[in-house]
């Protein structure tokens, strides 16, 4: 059915048929609007492709400079491993292990016999999610999100903390069930989830992405495992993305973040609004970004984890903090 009036349609309703001139103007106006929309869509698609190529080129250049570009993944890997070349081939710092209250990585990890009989067992912290959960953009293990949080929790609780990361660069929220299988095998005491950006890349509807996140959180909380989820950051602060695409992605990311936060809380987890609490601090501060100008740098991850850490400690204590409490407590927690 056409949305442009026709002579027959007007006559059938008993209305006066518009003149040929009026109909022509309306038709041409409609065509003009459609042409304008098509042009805008093509512009956005072109910007997306251009920005992606630029980010990938910078990532490869940085990896070559650091000596972290490695051969492709082993053939036969899971479908989730078939990612963009520069993501698959970049070797990330490794930080899984047991951390003491003074921040030392115990290597090798202590055996049960090495732990005093009256000492509490190590807490197990598991990281799930996408490239932000595994610290894509960092240059040393000390900058990894999981390591920062493990050391912070160990210092705050005066206990050993075992950190395991099952996140995957390029993962979408639909990958969480696979990650959960690995996570549950670790018998975690607390889980951190950072995910959502790749759902935007693949145009997964925000409500669907949030629902999948809520399901993952519910799977954990039903087992008595506390969960802290950092919601999607504001893509509007990433200047490597040109306008008007950046504004479009900003609105999408904020909508996704709001739905994620609601889903996490309804599932019994703690949601930390990174778009509100952290993203503004990236504006005008290029040192917060990695050399691909897209992912956070070590400093950027440090700022984000400073906001997440108080939420972890509160969840372990069976308490909840507000966003204001998180900001106020973060520096003290990290310097403890």
Predicted regions mapped to residue ranges:
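N-terminal secretory targeting modules
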Residues: 1-124, 313-315, 321-336
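Conserved SGNH/GDSL esterase-like catalytic core that processes O-acyl groups on lipids
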Residues: 124-126, 132-211
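Short hydrophobic segments within beta-strands
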Residues: 128-129, 230
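Generic structural signal for well-ordered alpha-helices
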Residues: 180, 213-217, 257
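Catalytic His-Asp segment of secreted/periplasmic serine-dependent ester chemistry enzymes
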Residues: 236-336
């Amino acid at each position: 059915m056409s949305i442009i009036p026709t002579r027959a349609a007007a006559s059938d309703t008993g209305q006066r048929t518009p003149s040929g001139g009026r109909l022509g103007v309306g038709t041409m106006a409609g065509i003009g609007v459609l042409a304008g929309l098509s042009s805008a869509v093509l512009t956005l698609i072109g910007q997306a492709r251009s920005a992606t190529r630029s980010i990938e080129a910078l990532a490869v250049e940085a990896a070559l400079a650091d000596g972290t570009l490695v051969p492709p993944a082993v053939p036969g890997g899971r479908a989730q491993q078939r990612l963009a070349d520069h993501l698959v081939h970049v070797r990330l710092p490794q930080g899984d292990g047991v951390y003491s209250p003074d921040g030392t990585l115990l290597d090798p990890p202590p055996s049960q016999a090495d732990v005093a009989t009256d000492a509490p067992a190590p807490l197990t912290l598991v990281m799930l999610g996408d490239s932000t959960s595994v610290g894509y953009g960092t240059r040393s293990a000390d900058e990894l999100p999981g390591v920062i949080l493990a050391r912070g929790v160990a210092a705050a609780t005066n206990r050993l903390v075992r950190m395991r990361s099952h996140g995957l660069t390029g993962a979408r929220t639909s990958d969480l069930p696979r990650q959960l299988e690995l996570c549950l095998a670790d018998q975690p005491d607390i889980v951190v989830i950072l995910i959502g950006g790749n759902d935007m890349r693949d145009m997964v509807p925000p409500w669907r992405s949030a629902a999948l996140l809520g399901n993952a959180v519910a799977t954990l909380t039903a087992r008595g495992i506390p969960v802290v989820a950092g919601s999607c950051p504001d893509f509007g602060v990433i200047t490597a993305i040109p306008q008007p695409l950046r504004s479009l992605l900003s609105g999408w990311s904020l909508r996704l973040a709001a739905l994620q936060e609601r889903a996490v809380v309804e599932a019994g987890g703690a949601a930390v609004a990174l778009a509100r609490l952290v993203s503004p601090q990236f504006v005008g501060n290029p040192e917060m970004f990695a050399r691909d100008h897209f992912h956070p740098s070590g400093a950027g991850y440090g700022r984000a984890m400073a906001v997440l850490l108080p939420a972890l400690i509160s969840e372990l204590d069976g308490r909840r903090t507000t966003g204001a409490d998180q900001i106020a407590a973060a520096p003290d927690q990290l310097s403890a």
